[in-house]
Amino acid sequence: MIGRFIDWEEEIRKEKEEKETSPEEILEGFSQTRLMKLLYFTCLASFENKKGFDLFRIFNNFEAYPRGPVEVDMYSNRSELTNFKYNGFYLEKLSDNEAVKISIDIAVKISIDRAINFLKQKKDSFNMLDTDFLVELSHKLPLWSMAYFSTSNQLNIKNIEYLSIEKKRFNDLIKVGN
């Protein structure tokens, strides 16, 4: 999924006619906060109000941190992400010699592609480059508020009704339908 975020940023930079930047340089610009928000919003974009596959089935341990939802398992194990190494500040892509080839289930790949394409279509109201924007957007959603001010800080993503409300609010905020 990180690779898809890098591709997306490359597309944005080309549209803005910015100087060409390598994927490694783009990756260096991804803070953990930005990655966690993009992960959450990608999962949320994949959610549909019916039984089916969504990314919350894989990334299912979100907690409310001060700067928005964080997938705790990913955050805690960020130094062990396959094909990337964490140098204390940001992720670095491993060389092809060091990288581990992993096959991704087709349903997961399709879900990721659909969710990211959905977000890309909202480029006028969803600024994936701006970490502060992503944090503020996450703070406008009800699940973060409910969890942040509770004793557990756990986002209740297993509750379909809550997730449906979250998705509707998210869609309203990013102007779905425009």
Regions found by a protein language model. Give the residues of each.
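Domain-edge interaction signal
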Residues: 1-178
